[in-house]
Amino acid sequence: MSAQVPTAGRIIQVLGPVVDVEFPPGGLPEVYTALKVTNANLSAAADNLTLEVAQHLGENTVRTIAMDSTEGLGRGMAVTNTGAPIQVPVGKATLGRILNVTGEPVDEMGPVKAQEYWSIHRAPPPFTEQDVRVQMFETGIKVIDLLAPYTRGGKIGLFGGAGVGKTVLLQELIRNVAVERGGFSVFAGVGERTREGNDLYHEMQDTKVIQTDNLEASQAVLVYGQMNEPPGARARVALSALTMAEYFRDVEGRDVLLFVDNIFRFTQAGSEVSALLGRIPSAVGYQPTLATEMGGLQERITSTTKGSITSVQAIYVPADDLTDPAPATAFAHLDATTVLNRSIAELAIFPAVDPLDSTSRILDPAVIGAEHYGVARKVQGILQRYKELQDIIAILGMDELSEDDKLVVARARKIQRFLSQPFFVAKVFTGKDGRYVKLQDTIQGFKEIAEGKHDDIPEGAFYMTGSIDEVVENARKLAAS
């Protein structure tokens, strides 16, 4: 911005989170520019409230969306034009910290000593820099790696109700990326409950992913826009977190895991902002720019020649209606879905991932290889046949089944138990040390079960184990006891 352009304006109207600001002639800031104003109700600091320009209302007036509470603002108050979009700190100084939408720390551990600040509005990587190779992202979790594998630089939708283990699965993924791959994780709490965000922070401390006594050794950043915050904050916090992840990918060349909980609330906040700006709503009351906003976020999540951002996004489905525009728009971008099922959790099989409902675009022999594909399809076939037989078993009992079907049921029950796995972050629940299972060991184990190599081993030996060698060892101990 040139030196001749005035940088000060004044508030002329406050309507909830919408603030109209008037500037002198020739000083109109661009759309997405961050403006600063002092709100004494928030803190004693100067310029403590950020406003983002959303519309030009005339030659000298802009309509802005506030990133925090506007209580305490009044007409005539001075507003400073920063001349740039919202800038957030990036780099290793952010590790181990809890930040808000504007990159300010909310963990009471002092300022973030970042060397660089990046704009949250960025273009996706150009085609020439994107990595076009389709590669599998190994998680070390058997059920995911075998049946619904993740794509490096892909987007995964995580569906799960309350209490089925969604948070534990997220934490295990964060732990595995940090410890097994030396990667970083960025967690975006979009419309998060404050309690859930607090719980996640303390659980990350317990697993040493965040080390408050040595922040440089931490391997995760938490960025929260809580559900009590204005829609402007909730609509932008995912972009703030993504910007921090992009730095680790593009500058440090790392494989980064980006968690967004919940992507529906990102859309919901955008809908609120759209209504506040007076736009005519589209289908089911959503903003007319729904697909554009979602695409702007999702297209930045990709692999480049330097590194990758793999995103796991929790998706709330309103009234279980998958045709609702919000989840339907998100589905178009997903490479894999991981569905957590309460009926599986009730069997005490954790992670409670549904092996038949979870999907992946890369479950294809051209990508994962013929052996992996063949074993995955064989396992799914056995589980599907078992599902079909369950009504007959419930009514008539096992004795009415043919010998072939009895064998299918026996193998399916072993597969079901072998899909369970002790997690590092869940040792307090299971009493067992966690297991990271390499992909080849996963394929080999399920191949042997499906082929009947372990038909003589009791079901109990398969429960909460890592590799098939551990199952054989369990069976030997059971036989000796």
UniProtKB/Swiss-Prot annotation:
Source organism of the structure? Myxococcus xanthus (strain DK1622)
Write the protein's name.
Answer: ATP synthase subunit beta
Q: Which domain of life is it from?
A: Bacteria
Asked if the keyword Cell inner membrane belongs to this entry, the reply reads yes
Write down the SUPFAM superfamilies for this protein, in alphabetical order: C-terminal domain of alpha and beta subunits of F1 ATP synthase, N-terminal domain of alpha and beta subunits of F1 ATP synthase, P-loop containing nucleoside triphosphate hydrolases
* GO cellular component term, pick one: proton-transporting ATP synthase complex
Q: How does it assemble?
A: F-type ATPases have 2 components, CF(1) - the catalytic core - and CF(0) - the membrane proton channel. CF(1) has five subunits: alpha(3), beta(3), gamma(1), delta(1), epsilon(1). CF(0) has three main subunits: a(1), b(2) and c(9-12). The alpha and beta chains form an alternating ring which encloses part of the gamma chain. CF(1) is attached to CF(0) by a central stalk formed by the gamma and epsilon chains, while a peripheral stalk is formed by the delta and b chains.
Its top-level enzyme class, in one word, is translocase
Assigned protein family: Belongs to the ATPase alpha/beta chains family.
Subcellular localization(s) per the UniProt record: Cell inner membrane
A Pfam family cross-referenced in the UniProt record is ATP-synt_ab_N
Question: Which residues hold ATP?
Answer: 160-167
Cell inner membrane is among the record's keywords: yes
Query: Where does it mainly reside?
Result: membrane
Q: Which reaction does it catalyse?
A: ATP + H2O + 4 H(+)(in) = ADP + phosphate + 5 H(+)(out)
The protein's role, per its UniProt record: Produces ATP from ADP in the presence of a proton gradient across the membrane. The catalytic sites are hosted primarily by the beta subunits.
Q: How does it sit in the membrane?
A: Peripheral membrane protein
Q: What is its EC number?
A: 7.1.2.2
Q: Which UniProt keywords apply?
A: ATP synthesis, ATP-binding, Cell inner membrane, Cell membrane, CF(1), Hydrogen ion transport, Ion transport, Membrane, Nucleotide-binding, Translocase, Transport
GO terms, molecular function: ATP binding; ATP hydrolysis activity; proton-transporting ATP synthase activity, rotational mechanism
Concerning InterPro entries, the annotation shows: AAA+_ATPase (IPR003593), ATP-synt_VA_C (IPR055190), ATP_synth_F1_bsu (IPR005722), ATPase_a/bsu_AS (IPR020003), ATPase_alpha/beta_chains (IPR050053), ATPase_F1/V1/A1_a/bsu_N (IPR004100), ATPase_F1/V1/A1_a/bsu_N_sf (IPR036121), ATPase_F1/V1/A1_a/bsu_nucl-bd (IPR000194)
